[in-house]
Amino acid sequence: MALLGIKLMTLVFAAWLSCCHSSSALPSSGLSGPCLNHSCLLRNSLNGASQWGTILHSPAVGSNCPPCPMMSIMGCSPPKPLQSNSYGVLCSTIASKAKQDLKLCWKEVQTRSEMYSKRISAALIDSLHQAVGMLLMIIIWIWSSIFLVVYHVLAYMTTYHLSSAVCVGFLIFCTICAFRLISWICGDLLAFNVSGLTPIWVNFSESSCPAGLSLRRYKNEKTVEGYKPFIIPQKSPKKSVIELSFSNGSHLGYATCVRLWDGSICLMTAKHCLVKEALLKGRVAGHSLPVKNFDLFLTCDEIDFSLLRGPKQWEAYLGVKGADLITSNRIGRSPVTFYNLSKDGEWLANSAQITGRHGKLCSVLSNTSPGDSGTPYYSGKNVVGIHKGTSELENYNLMIPIPNIPGLTSPDFKFETTNVRGNLYNDEGFRLSVGEDDKAEHWTDRLMKSITFKTKRWADWAEEESESDDERGKVVPPAKPSNYGEGCPPEHNQYLSDVGDLLTKVIGPEQNEKCVDILMGIMGVDKNEVAPHKEEKAEKGNEAVVSATVKTVKEPTTQCDEDIISEIVKRVVDKMNLKAIEKSVVEILAEKAMTKAPRGKRKNSKDTSRPSTPGSYIIPAKRTPDSGPVEKSLNSTGRAKEESPSGARTLPGNIPAWVR
């Protein structure tokens, strides 16, 4: 019930508002006083609802409805028909209704367009996802197909043509290694002297295509993309760069004053810069000279090179000097410099870089502008080439190298020497008489006796030093030769020497005495009959044989052949104890490694400094020329003490009063 009451009150309030709105819209003469008719309220409320944007179609409610009975009761006058309203009221009503209808249509269009745009965007997103997925699948399929093809090709080659494939791979590897070896050996000369490495298609295009249709086309100038040079204001070496201009004074190009190896001074430039009535401007002297006064004596149309001879003293007239040349056979990859004029008429040095070979020209990284043709490229103070232009197909400029002409652009040295026509002395005529005192052995002995070594000779050093400093200066006399074998037959001495060498090589010098005892027992030599000399030593290499004098020795049999030697070696080896030898060697080495070699007594060296003198005065003879008297050091590293404290007034000194 409460909700129904609220709804009824809302309907009555809306009807009252509609009535008030309609009464204000109608003329005041026809609608005087409030109207409480139910049908009028309903009609007005419907009209008001249509004005607020709600279209209601009710056939029961019309403009010609009879007057409500409530109006007579409430004192309301019946509403007037629509025909009685003015055109303004009707037009405003129609305009308001059209406005509301347009708003409704616009809202409907917005709703529909938003719905359709959402559908279209969703469809586009779905199609994009599908396209990306298909693209990825295509890439995967192509990639996997390439791997499968490579796998099948390799499987086929290894199955049916393994040897041929290995040979081809080995040849490719050898070719790459040979090319790298040639590049490493030749270096930069490979780009100019190895003509066989020039691409074949370039030569074919030059020979088969006409001049206008050639694949190698050139322009005059172009900047290189990506190359950043540095530019500084600087004049050319020897002021050798000359400006070329037209007859009206406008800029044409550049030329170079060069000095040839025959001593002449010539003008060098690009051939396309030689224009009729061209002038040479001398920036130093301010003079001009026409190019027609020069004679063209060397030209090359293939590389656009020209060399001209001028009148006498033309370089002095223009104020230039000749620069030296570097020909094409000595050019390599290196930084170079070229010179041009700025807008203010000042010379500028521009950096460039020679990168390689372009046919018979050189490729250069440089930034040039129209009018830079003919300017020279310098390596230090020498000219290496002339600026030509650029290629339409490549991203670099071109430089004209200087042709190698011996005697003109390069030196032609001829080494001349006199021929030898005979000897002044021969061996017989120049041979001098040499006495006994003049032999080489005599002078060698005298020289060795006169030399006193402060240290030992290399052959006199032992493994351990046990000598004092006084003994080091002495010369060790050579060992006396042993007198072993004086009473033995020569066959026996040779036999013992051979056996000693063999035993020394097999068992080493550690078991020398035992081996000698065994050998004497085998040969039947009595040990008591041998008188060894302890002060004498055997020669180096025969340490297994003891130096001794044999008194009585049985003569050996003449059947000393290889069987006896092999039997001796076999018996000696059987009696050897290798483990004991190895153990003793290890012990000796360990003992030597842990012991320190003794040293001689140390002595103080003599004083090398000059004696100090007491007092502050030192005589000039004892003064050191590179140092002065030592000043007193400060107490700390802080600020030095001032003569007067800060802020104190200084004494006037000898300043006159009139100055103060």
UniProtKB/Swiss-Prot annotation:
Q: Which InterPro entries match?
A: Luteovirus_Orf2, Peptidase_S1_PA, Peptidase_S1_PA_chymotrypsin, Peptidase_S39B_luteovirus
Does Membrane count among this protein's keywords?
Answer: yes
GO terms for biological process? proteolysis; viral translational frameshifting
> What would be one Pfam family of this protein?
Peptidase_S39
Q: Please give the start and end residues of each transmembrane region.
A: 131-151, 165-185
According to UniProt, where does the site described as Cleavage lie?
221-222, 416-417
How the protein sits in the membrane? Multi-pass membrane protein
Give the Peptidase S39 domain ranges: 224-416
Instruction: Provide the active-site residues from the annotation.
Output: 272 (for protease activity), 304 (for protease activity), 373 (for protease activity)
Q: Where in the cell is it found?
A: Host membrane
Q: For this UniProt entry, which residues form the secretion signal?
A: 1-25
Q: What is this protein called?
A: Genome-linked protein precursor
Protein source organism: Poinsettia latent virus (isolate Euphorbia pulcherrima/Germany/Siepen/2005)
Lineage at the top is: Viruses, Riboviria, Orthornavirae, Pisuviricota, Pisoniviricetes
